[in-house]
Amino acid sequence: LLGGELVEILIVDDGSTDDTAKIADAYAEKYPTIVKAIHKENGGHGDAVNTGIAHATGVYFKVVDSDDWLDKEAYKQVLKVLKKLVEDEKDLDVLLSNYIYDKVERRKKRVMRYHGALPEKRIISWEDSRIRFNKFQYVLMHSVIYRTQLLKDCGLQLPKHTFYVDNLYIFEPMIHVKKLMYLNVDLYHYYIGREGQSVNEKTMMKRIDQQMLVNRTLIQFFSENRKELPPQMYRFLFQYLDMMMCVA
């Protein structure tokens, strides 16, 4: 497995009805010091993330959805950077990298990059005036690698059986982030186009009530914390809210 003993892989079987449990157990048996298979009743995407955080023992935490995948070369670069940070005892709360919209039947792939939004390969704080996200530079779950202890300490609990909670995964922990870094590599392939997928337009229309529930939660959270936010973080979260309102 790429990464070897440097990486702890948690496979969360969230009540799957296919061969997920069998495949997860096979990997855990073959790589007992690397892979953990976690079986639980279905609680939805958010609860699977909660379970992963609760079981994680690594320094950093990355969510990879079952539809998606990571680029091998970019993955190597990310691991190299994170390993060096840990060895040098450098404080970093979140690492941002690029993601690719991998749409079905579309040859040309759109890449979400953050050049110009913040310096590359430098640890900075939200007080840094160079942080300038534009309104088209969406930071999604696919972009971030959080420090595991930050996720545990901030008390993040994504709601069960609710779609679109990945937005809460960005929004709520981010106010606890003191140090961040951008690595300009195309790491995450975000697969779009599977029938019934939560971001499918028809599916989103059917679940607009859940989108609105998440949006109300984001607005309330922002209202309760906005006075304490550094200017750059305030601007980032406000733009994020604006994007979510447009989607809804």
Provide a role label for each language-model segment:
Residues 45, 69-180, 188-192, 196-205:
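Donor-binding/catalytic cores of nucleotide-activated saccharide
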Residues 191-248:
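C-terminal subregions of glycosyltransferases and related glycan-biosynthesis enzymes
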